[in-house]
Amino acid sequence: MINTKVTLAGVELKNPVMTASGTFGSGAEYSEFVDLNKLGGVVTKGVANVPWPGNPTPRVTETASGMLNAIGLQNPGIDLFCRRDIPFLKQYDTKIIVNVCGKSTEDYCEVVEKLADEPVDLLEINVSCPNVKEGGIAFGQNPHALEAITKEVKKYAKQPIIMKLSPNVTDITEMARAAEAGGADILSLINTLTGMKIDIYRKTFALANKTGGMSGPAVKPVAVRMVYQVTQAVKLPIIGMGGIATAEDALEFIMAGATAVSVGTANFFNPYATTEIVDGLAKFMEQQKVEDINQLIGIVK
């Protein structure tokens, strides 16, 4: 009997496969295609203290082996989220991870405080989205600001805290150490890489926001490299993401040192990606005669 269970800061997941924030709604949108009970966890779309309208359109465009998005963290706000989305997810046997966004330290803390007594398992703090003009980018790209906001958020949190790191920095390990120093329980990486696309026929930017976050298969080698670097630099468990579309992709991250993985852009071109990866991991373990998936974590030194 193979064991696919992994543990993140004392929270046990039935397997290491989760959704990535912003690509799976809050689960309801995919529940017709995906048996949410099969997933290790569902990471919700980012939620703020008040509703956000998001950026003007166009907000999404395709790139070679990927996409650019500048959604702007459109969300219904924490109050509606708690009334509508958490009760829906509680119907399923999967861990609930709420992604939190904000434009100031106070915004983040307000959301975290409201979630303190809700039946959610982990909180992922989004300090790295590159398409919001205020707030997040400054926290995610400055180690002092990142350490400070981690400390503040921890004061209000009852659940373990995941700090989601931006790849748009000179040294990802410096940011990882800053989050660790601030008291983070878990790190997740990478968020999207900042990119741009020009519409040569309209002679303007493809996105109304000019820049957007690049994701999809094209970013995977960068993400695997950064996950490996971070696992060598800190003692925290890591959730790896960035271009994961198959079990083989997920295994690269796990072997590089990630305890769990998040599947994002793949959900758009293959709604069944997450459960296919769950099955693919089990199949690989059986073929390779690996009894416990934890034996594969960080096997590449």
Locate each region found by the language model.
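N-terminal capping/small domains of soluble enzymes
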Residues: 1-96, 102
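Short, surface-exposed connector motifs at secondary-structure boundaries
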Residues: 11-14, 91-96, 156-161, 232-236, ...
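Hydrophobic faces of well-ordered beta-strands that scaffold small-molecule active sites
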Residues: 17-20, 40-44, 96-100, 123-125, ...
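Alpha/beta enzyme core
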Residues: 32, 103-239, 245-256
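C-terminal helical cap(s) of enzyme catalytic domains, especially alpha/beta-barrels
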Residues: 54-64, 198-212, 254, 266-291
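Structural signal for hydrophobic packing residues in well-ordered secondary-structure cores
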Residues: 93, 116-119, 157, 281-289
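A short, charged, Gly/Pro-tolerant segment at domain boundaries
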Residues: 294-301
